[in-house]
């Protein structure tokens, strides 16, 4: 197994540790979870660059890399929902992202069974980057709140502002998620009809 594929697998292996850090309430648990998410996100940047620059692109990598992204992002969103960071309507973006990811994965599986590999397109990459940025900003804001709370500083107003910023970024990434899903479907509709 080559280095880019190992980095992709590392991203998946980090997910259970991320879940524990998110859901087990201990001092600065958002900092720990955010660091794990950050390391996993960095592997996403490097696996593709290394694969392309060293001519190590494989069918496994084309399939597993976006799958690892889906697992990481969906896990983060579900954890945010569980701990109340996405608010009353937070389930809506999570459901939209989940539906899109299942639909695109279905397209990929149908294509793979016919010997065709559906690689990520630019809209899929924009979607992933916007999700990673939104999630990372939420972590950064939660770490600020953890520090302020540790210093016994009132966080009421700051917490509310952070809540709206974080939710706005998640909803923006959800728009990109919808666009990329529609484009995937449009680009592969003729192939799906034939199968």
Where do the PLM segments sit?
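Structural signature of transmembrane alpha-helix termini at the membrane-water interface
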Residues: 17-24, 46-49, 78-84, 103-106, ...
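C-terminal membrane-associated helical module and adjoining short loops/tails
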Residues: 1-5, 14-15, 34-41, 115-195
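Juxtamembrane helix-capping/reentrant segments at transmembrane boundaries
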Residues: 1-4, 47, 51-69, 115-127
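Membrane-embedded alpha-helical segments that form the functional core of polytopic membrane enzymes
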Residues: 14-63, 76-98, 161-176
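Core segments of transmembrane alpha-helices
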Residues: 10-17, 68-77, 104-105, 127-139
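Multi-pass alpha-helical membrane architecture of UbiA-family
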Residues: 4-7, 79
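Cytoplasmic juxtamembrane interface segments
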Residues: 2, 11, 95-121
């Amino acid at each position: 197994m080559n280095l880019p594929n190992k980095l992709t697998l590392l991203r998946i292996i980090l997910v259970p540790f991320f879940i524990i850090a998110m859901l087990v309430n201990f001092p600065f648990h958002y900092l720990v979870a955010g660091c794990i998410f950050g390391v996993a996100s960095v592997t996403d940047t490097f696996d593709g660059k290394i694969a392309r620059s060293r001519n190590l692109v494989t069918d496994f990598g084309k399939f597993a890399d976006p799958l690892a992204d889906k697992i990481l992002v969906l896990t983060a969103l579900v954890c945010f929902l569980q701990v109340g960071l996405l608010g009353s309507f937070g389930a809506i973006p999570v459901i939209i992202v989940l539906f899109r990811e299942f639909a695109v994965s279905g397209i990929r599986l149908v294509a793979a069974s016919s010997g065709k590999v559906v690689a990520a397109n630019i809209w899929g990459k924009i979607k992933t980057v916007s999700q990673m940025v939104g999630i990372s900003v939420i972590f950064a804001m939660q770490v600020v709140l953890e520090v302020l709370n540790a210093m016994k500083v009132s966080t009421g107003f700051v917490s509310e502002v952070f809540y709206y910023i974080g939710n706005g970024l998640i909803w923006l990434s959800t728009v990109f998620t919808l666009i990329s899903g529609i484009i995937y479907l449009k680009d592969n509709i003729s192939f799906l009809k034939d199968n």
